[in-house]
Amino acid sequence: MTSIEPTHTGKKVIVGMSGGVDSSVSAYLLMQQGYQVEGLFMKNWEEDDNNEYCAAAEDLKDAQAVCDKLGIKLHTVNFAAEYWDNVFEYFLAEYKAGRTPNPDIMCNKEIKFKAFLEFADEILDADYIAMGHYVRRRDNSDGSTQMLRGVDGNKDQSYFLYTLSHEQVARSLFPVGELEKHEVREIAKEMGLITHDKKDSTGICFIGERKFTEFLGTYLPAQPGNIETPEGEVIGTHQGLMYHTLGQRKGLGIGGMKNSNDDPWYVVDKDLERNVLIVGQGGHHPRLMSTGMTVNQLHWVDRTGPVDGCHIAVKTRYRQQDVPCTLTYTDEHTLRVVFDEPVAAVTPGQSAVFYDGEVCLGGGIIDQLIRG
């Protein structure tokens, strides 16, 4: 491997060590660049400490092994109370209200780049923090800092980080954002790090590998209701609207309906007042398509945001292709977004994240859908 000339001698970086390959390689790369590196492992969930689904003990063991291999300190911190108050209660409240939240975005906002940064500052005297996220930062000549998409388009995580301020971005380093995922694994293998072939974590961290309905049912009571077609025909029952999201195809239990064509059934709407799940056939059913949306709880990385009437790109879910759109401010907290072409399965409660080329501008929460 080509060695990197150290350029940051003396600057202290606290790396969020998750026990995964991305944070492992981030720590190694920062050491190569001359930073004084220490690790910090966060414990954010305590409900499953004695449960088969909890991977925290194994992750801590892997993080410690990597730090031992690299010859750096590993600190630990418990943010379970902050996580419960600021992430999990939000998650439950949104589902209870019939929306589909994204707790990973809230975790980045409240824990990884707030509680973690404060702890690194106040307790560990850090100059920077670092995470294994696939994004990049750009320091401009005017002193501003921007967040860019990661080089690996399939792994780019800017969608999950749009709530960061430019001050937080300026305090953060993202070494693997400049690399493809396969390069990260190759570096880890070359350095003999035990995480080099560790499986990437998927899904919501506190749910782990268990079934979503089983998990959510322990915190929110089931509210069964009817499944109807857009025409009002009752064709089945559901256990709770919270278990379903727009565009969902699997797990509806209504396959093989008589008098229907062979197209699969999709969730196309939720009637919250009647507690009815509305389904239609085909992934481009008219009720599933939106021509636009309103977005509130706006956050812009540079605090100012795009200008009124501009034509830029938006993602309404992770790994979605960029959707060209036009923005209009209805007030300082709300945007009306009109897509160039109709988009399927835009989901209230999820985040809409806006881009100008490679730059992640920020975003907000999808509130209302515009149809027709």
UniProtKB/Swiss-Prot annotation:
InterPro entries: MnmA-like (IPR004506), MnmA-like_C (IPR046885), MnmA-like_central (IPR046884), MnmA-like_central_sf (IPR023382), Rossmann-like_a/b/a_fold (IPR014729). Its EC number is 2.8.1.13. The active site is at C107, C205. GO terms for molecular function: ATP binding; tRNA binding; tRNA-uridine 2-sulfurtransferase activity. It catalyses: S-sulfanyl-L-cysteinyl-[protein] + uridine(34) in tRNA + AH2 + ATP = 2-thiouridine(34) in tRNA + L-cysteinyl-[protein] + A + AMP + diphosphate + H(+). Residues 102-104 are annotated as: Interaction with target base in tRNA. The record marks H133, Q350 as: Interaction with tRNA. It is found in: Cytoplasm. Disulfide bonds join C107-C205. Keywords: ATP-binding, Cytoplasm, Disulfide bond, Nucleotide-binding, RNA-binding, Transferase, tRNA processing, tRNA-binding. The keyword Disulfide bond applies. GO terms for cellular component: cytoplasm. The keyword Cytoplasm applies. CDD domains: MnmA_TRMU-like (cd01998). Residues 155-157, 317-318 are annotated as: Interaction with tRNA. GO terms for biological process: tRNA wobble position uridine thiolation. Pfam families: tRNA_Me_trans, tRNA_Me_trans_C, tRNA_Me_trans_M. ATP binds at G16, M17, S18, G19, G20, V21, D22, S23, M42, G132. Belongs to the MnmA/TRMU family. PANTHER family: MITOCHONDRIAL TRNA-SPECIFIC 2-THIOURIDYLASE 1 (PTHR11933:SF5), TRNA 5-METHYLAMINOMETHYL-2-THIOURIDYLATE -METHYLTRANSFERASE (PTHR11933). Catalyzes the 2-thiolation of uridine at the wobble position (U34) of tRNA, leading to the formation of s(2)U34. This is tRNA-specific 2-thiouridylase MnmA. It comes from Shewanella baltica (strain OS185). The lineage of its organism: Bacteria, Pseudomonadati, Pseudomonadota, Gammaproteobacteria, Alteromonadales.
